[in-house]
Amino acid sequence: MTDFRDQERYDAHQEAMRNSRRAKQRSSARSQQRRRRMIAVSILLLPVAIAAFAFTWSRSSPPPKPAKPLPTTTTPNQSAAEQAVGGRIAMPDHVRGVHVTSYAAASPALFEPIMALADPKVGMNAIQIDVKDERGEIAFSTPIPLGKESGAHQDVYEPVKVLRRAHAAGLYTIARVVVFQDGYAPQADPSIALRTTSGALWKNDLGITWLDPTNEKAWDYPIQVAQYAAELGFDEIMFDYVRYPTDGDASTIAFADPGRPRQDTITAFLKKASATLKPQGVHVSAAFFGLAATDDLGIGQWPGKLRNTLDAVYPMIYPSHFTDGQFGIDKPGDTPGPTIAAAMSDWRRKTNGGSMQIRPWLQDFTLGGINYGTREVREQISAADRTGAGGWLLWNAQCVYSPGVFNGTSGQP
């Protein structure tokens, strides 16, 4: 069982890195040209400036009017960082948003079209932004020692600037924090790394290391990242890759506590994370595999045990990732509406009686089978809303979303 997002995100990440380098090179070249022009113009205008100053030195100008502050929802109990981003946004009854990578958050070409979708009343009212991604990269500098020592800090976007922009538009902000898959921390601190039976660092099929889920010391680092994101003013923390590995040679893994039941391990981590974070006034959620409510996948994800711990769960019920015949549907990928409805039925049954909202990840990309566009995405949205979802998020690794999918999506069946 492979998480398709690994390769998809890796490809998108590499492309984003290439675009970022090209943009920096172009920006540097433009800056040098501007500096040369400014120096030349300054030399030409220097005599004029001196004469103008001699004429106006004794005249005073009224002070400029202060800039009108952005509306906020701050309270005296909020941190300076929270107030800087306009306070927290209350959790919507029905969350409607999209996935945004760290590089998309830093790219006006990608971020501006996403922000144009914002309409808290009848359209997009939430935005999920990567803080710590599946490679272990943290999108900005933090005071966390292991983040610094491991080289995980990438300084991709300015979190306060991005959060202030999102909150000013009325958007509920969700920080995505990848937990156990991490290409940086295990190499800087092997004591918390997932190891092989020979003692080497274990790596998955993409060559990425992992933190050991059974070593509770390994839990501290992702929780610290989440705490810092909460301190900055994110409204919700979503933990992803909060599971055991699903690819790579699992037969060579030597867990620190191999006898610990997997469901108990993941449940305990999320309970500890939730208890740590909620006093900061932030909501806590997790992304789970789509079939985690249908079968025990052997990766520790058992939503029924978390029904009163998490504020929300985000099952990845992308239609194209179910095998033919799943839910009694001939080709789930070609039948998006019924597939979402069937998957949601399992999730509602598994979490029945709890306070945890179900907000599925929906598919806005094509992967075999039919092409996915506005119609197919809207079919999924309609099915999710009809079956009692507490909202949904759209996934596209390139962060380019189908037009018109948010039109009038108020959450009514």
Region roles according to the model:
Residues M1-R30:
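N-terminal targeting leaders characterized by basic, low-complexity, disordered sequences
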Residues I127, A166, T173, P222, ...:
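Conserved, mostly hydrophobic/aromatic
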Residues F140-S150, D182-N204, D247-P258:
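Aromatic- and acidic-residue-enriched segments that line the glycan-binding/catalytic groove
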Residues H99, Y172-D182, M238-F239, P245, ...:
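Aromatic-lined carbohydrate-recognition surfaces of secreted/lumenal glycan-active proteins
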Residues F111-E137, A230-I237, N308-A312, A384-W392:
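Catalytic domains of carbohydrate-active enzymes, especially glycoside hydrolases
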Residues L310-D324, P332-P413:
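Substrate-binding cleft of secreted/luminal carbohydrate-active enzymes
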Residues G86-A105, F180-Y228:
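Active-site-adjacent "subsite" loops/lids of carbohydrate-active enzymes
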Residues A126-Q128, Y157-W202, M238:
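Glycine-rich, aromatic-flanked loop segments that form ligand/cofactor-binding clefts
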